[in-house]
């Protein structure tokens, strides 16, 4: 009998779900829209602040892991636990939790990746550095291509170690996120409670 995904070690999960990249797929934007509408259909509007397509699949023209990253920002007055219960009820699986952050996935199966795979990043409003990085890459195609080249190199080196792959990109992401914050100033800093 096969182990359940939640009973697998990180090493077993990395074997089943290796890092792989593919050329940009124009359908990724539509998949994001469909999934964001689905999420809006089961989460009450007062529990949502904003949803965003983030990650490399949101950047046209660069290779990416074919996983749609969604940033779901909620008002600080909302209880993450109640949103977590709803997400689990509607097919999302927990990935990680830390102070004020939860991550979920959908599309991971015992046979490997499903056709459509999603990572949902649940955060309180204001924890959204990924938006600055995304916008900087969209506005600076040479930097986006540099990021793509870095990922292509790291892909084969860390194909079966997602944590190392992510860590190896961190300095690049931090550097350009800081540049973006200086350039775009307070682009995403609305005033909400």
Model-based region annotation:
Residues 46, 91-92:
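Short glycine-aromatic motifs
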Residues 124, 128-193:
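Catalytic cores of NTP-dependent nucleotidyl/adenyl transfer enzymes across multiple folds
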């Amino acid at each position: 009998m096969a182990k359940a995904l939640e009973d697998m070690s990180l090493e077993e999960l990395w074997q089943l779900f290796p890092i792989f990249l593919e050329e940009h797929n124009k359908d990724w934007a539509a998949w994001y829209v469909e999934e964001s509408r689905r999420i809006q259909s089961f989460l009450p509007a007062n529990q949502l602040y904003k949803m965003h397509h983030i990650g490399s699949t949101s950047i046209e023209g660069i290779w990416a892991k074919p996983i749609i990253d969604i940033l779901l920002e909620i008002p600080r007055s909302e209880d993450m636990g109640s949103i977590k219960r709803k997400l689990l009820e509607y097919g999302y699986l927990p990935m990680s939790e830390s102070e004020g952050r939860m991550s979920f996935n959908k599309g991971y199966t015992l046979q490997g990746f499903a056709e459509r795979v999603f990572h949902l990043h649940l955060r309180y409003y204001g924890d959204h550095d990924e938006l600055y990085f995304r916008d900087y890459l969209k506005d600076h195609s040479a930097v986006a291509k540099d990021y793509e080249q870095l990922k292509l190199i790291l892909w084969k080196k860390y194909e079966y170690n997602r944590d190392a792959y992510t860590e190896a990109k961190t300095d690049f992401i931090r550097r350009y996120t800081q540049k973006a914050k200086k350039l775009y100033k307070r682009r995403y800093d609305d005033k909400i409670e």
